[in-house]
Amino acid sequence: MLRSLYSGISGLRSHQTMLDVTGNNIANVNTTAFKASAAQFQDTLSQLTQAAGGATPTAGGTNPAQVGLGVQVAGISTNFAQGSSQATGKSTDLMISGDGFFVTALGGETLYTRAGSFEFDSAGRLVTPDGAIVQGWGAVDGVVADGGATGNISLPVGAIVPAEKSTAATFSGNLPSDAEDGSTLVRTVDVYDDLGNSRTVSLTFTRTTTPDGWTVGQTGGAPADVVQLTAETDADGPTGNFGDVTGFAVDGITINLNDLKGFSGLATVAGATDDGNEAGTLNSYTLGADGTLVGLFSNGQQQAIGRIALATFVNPGGLEKAGSSAYRATFNSGGAELGTPGAAGLGSLTSGALEMSNVDLSQEFTNLIVAQRGFQANARIITTSDEVLQELTNLKR
């Protein structure tokens, strides 16, 4: 039989594979974070019909004569170039800008994906559409310990941030320098005890006969337990500041008066606690560019709950596709190197966006034409070889 017949068959098979790869790329043009593939060809064994001959003093050397035996698929590579961004506005949609992969766990197997379309399930775990659980590091008392063993990223449903006792409060704003002597301003601030119970601390500001001066004391407190506020002056007169402001304590709360001013006309003094809060329950959450899941509590407090892990590979092209836009590590990809979003080589996260497919339709349709024409050309090899064989069989007539 003619060798060209089998060469044509190998060409059909190889170009059919190219058509399959190209068709799959086009089919996934709108698949989240899909990475296009490409088929590479190489020739097969060649039959040596004449060996090379070395040069002699009386004759020149001769090159080997070889007849190729067709083509085969050398490999199918994956293009891991960054896809474009698609804004979704959904807080659990995450896009990686960089080379990292999300780490997921499904059925006891660790998988890796670029597709950041996530949801929280009924158990509060962050999962992919097919149920793989996103992995990362949990937080203890709001502090994430990176670098250890990873676990499920989850929202602790019904979580409570404990109450914290108030220890300090700050009064700021303006005490009017043109207020009448003896006039008073009463201002309050709410503080918390160890159990989160709220109570009110009240201060009375009294205008003194000292130029632009005031005294401050606890409302209803002893007259001796007051602080004198003396207006500060320079060569041009009053500066609007109080000199040598000394804080004091009221019922165990340190009062800070350093932000008070003394300009005319305005009475804007107000108090605020520097710390302390009542107990709060988890209301909502945010996801940051560094992968930190932050819980927002009913008492206004924010606390880190966990941080999403990202993985990189020495050879991402060695990853094996596992379906559902996921990959698994192989011997040739190397082991996963874990880190936090924002670290070198891993990339940062964007919440409310997804990475689009990196399929280039213009390139894929060109590849489709090339594969089709290659298939047709190899089919002609077979039909032509068949005609030659037909002529051979007709020689007997």
Where are these regions (language model features)?
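N-terminal intrinsically disordered, low-complexity, charge/repeat-rich segments that act as generic
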Residues: 1-43
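Small/polar low-complexity and glycine-rich loop motifs
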Residues: 2, 28, 35-367, 374
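Hydrophobic a/d positions of heptad-repeat alpha-helices that form coiled-coil
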Residues: 12, 16-19, 368, 375, ...
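Residues at alpha-helix boundaries and short interhelical turns
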Residues: 13-16, 358, 396
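Core alpha-helical elements of the protein kinase catalytic domain
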Residues: 24, 373-376, 380
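Structured functional modules or segments
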Residues: 388-397
